[in-house]
Amino acid sequence: MWQEEDLIRANHCEPEELETNVIVRYPEDQRAAMREWYGNLITMMSEEGVREKGHLQINKNVILNLTELHNALSSSPKFPFYSAAYFKALPFIVELRTKNGKKEEPELETCFEALYGVLLLRLQKKPISEGTAKAIEAISSFLSMLANYYDKDRKVELKLDE
């Protein structure tokens, strides 16, 4: 979704620009739904004051939900592999938070920003340093486990307190 927010910003939050630059590339039968979807996102971005920067509340809520689950998983002795993946990624998370000057930023937001940053580098065909690749590998592994547990939690298949 962060990419969608950026795509909307790149098109100046203007439905006409999105139509010309994005929507016309899709099959005709999908365009009406896309117009409505992007229109709703533009409205939300305007109402929430994130037209220039920041993230929609729905995206922030996902981070909050993931953080809640992360805290439950990491405080439970039932998930040692999850804790190990987290502690393997933690030095990279701390380093990234220090580098970006956002020491108070939630850890998971830092992780997603790192992944998104690498995605943007790859899209621009820019090199990724060995250190960054190593950090992203650890962070990706950690987030992959969290995503798996999140999916199980949403399906009510995750037993945290048994």
Where are these regions (language model features)?
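Extended amphipathic alpha-helical scaffold segments
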Residues: P15-E19, Y38-M45, Y86-R97, F112-L119
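A charged, amphipathic interaction segment
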Residues: L56-L115
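Glycine-rich, aromatic-bearing surface loops/beta-hairpins
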Residues: V94-E162
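Short amphipathic alpha-helical coiled-coil/interface segments
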Residues: Y38-L41, I63-L66, I139
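Short, charged, amphipathic alpha-helical segments
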Residues: T20-N21, K60, F87, A133
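Amphipathic alpha-helical interaction surfaces
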Residues: L7-A10, E28, T43-R51, E68-S76, ...
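Charged low-complexity stretches with an acidic bias
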Residues: E47-N71, R154-E162
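N-terminal interaction modules that seed assembly of large macromolecular complexes
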Residues: M1-K53
